[in-house]
C-alpha cells in the first residue's frame, strides 16, 4: 500500500469525490485508510451508565485506496506515485508527474 499516515489525499471516486483530507490511520491488510472529515457515517449509541450518553455519533469510515490519490507536496497536484531505491539502498516514494521524492 502506497499511502501512509499524515499523507494529504484527494478522493477521486464515491460520494465524497473532490474532497481532500489527511490520512489518520491506514489498514494495510484490507487496503483501506481513514481520512479526516471524509466518508462520514452516523452510528447510534446506547447510554452506558453515566459515563456515556446516548445519541447519534458521526465518525469517519474507511475508504479503499483505489478511490484516493496522493496530493504531491511539491507540485500541489493529485499524482500517481511510484517507489525507487536511492544510492544508499533506502526505498522512497516519488511523484511520477514531477519526479520529486515525496518522503
Swiss-Prot record:
**SMART domains given for it?**
KOW
Instruction: Supply the alphabetized keyword list.
Output: Ribonucleoprotein, Ribosomal protein, RNA-binding, rRNA-binding
Which Pfam families does UniProt cross-reference here?
A: KOW, ribosomal_L24
> Which processes are annotated in GO (biological process)?
translation
GO cellular component terms given for this protein: ribonucleoprotein complex; ribosome
Q: Name one GO molecular function term.
A: rRNA binding
Q: Which InterPro entries match?
A: KOW (IPR005824), Rib_uL2_dom2 (IPR014722), Ribosomal_uL24 (IPR003256), Ribosomal_uL24_CS (IPR005825), Ribosomal_uL24_KOW (IPR041988), Translation_prot_SH3-like_sf (IPR008991)
For this chain, the family text in UniProt reads: Belongs to the universal ribosomal protein uL24 family.
Recorded hits in HAMAP family, A to Z, give: Ribosomal_uL24_B (MF_01326_B)
What this protein is reported to do is described as: One of two assembly initiator proteins, it binds directly to the 5'-end of the 23S rRNA, where it nucleates assembly of the 50S subunit. One of the proteins that surrounds the polypeptide exit tunnel on the outside of the subunit.
Kindly state the subunit structure of this protein. Answer: Part of the 50S ribosomal subunit.
Q: What is this protein called?
A: Large ribosomal subunit protein uL24
Lineage, highest ranks first = Bacteria, Bacillati, Chloroflexota, Dehalococcoidia, Dehalococcoidales
- Per the record, the gene is rplX
Amino acid at each position: 500500500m502506497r499511502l501512509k499516515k499524515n499523507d494529504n489525499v484527494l478522493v477521486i471516486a464515491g460520494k465524497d469525490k473532490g474532497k481532500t483530507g489527511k490520512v489518520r490511520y491506514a489498514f494495510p491488510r484490507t487496503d483501506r485508510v481513514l481520512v479526516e472529515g471524509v466518508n462520514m457515517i452516523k452510528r447510534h449509541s446506547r447510554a452506558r451508565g453515566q459515563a456515556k450518553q446516548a445519541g447519534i455519533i458521526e465518525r469517519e469510515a474507511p475508504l479503499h485506496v483505489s478511490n484516493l490519490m496522493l496530493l504531491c507536496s511539491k507540485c500541489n497536484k493529485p499524482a500517481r506515485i511510484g517507489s525507487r531505491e536511492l544510492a544508499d539502498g533506502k526505498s522512497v516514494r516519488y511523484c511520477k508527474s514531477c519526479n520529486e521524492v515525496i518522503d
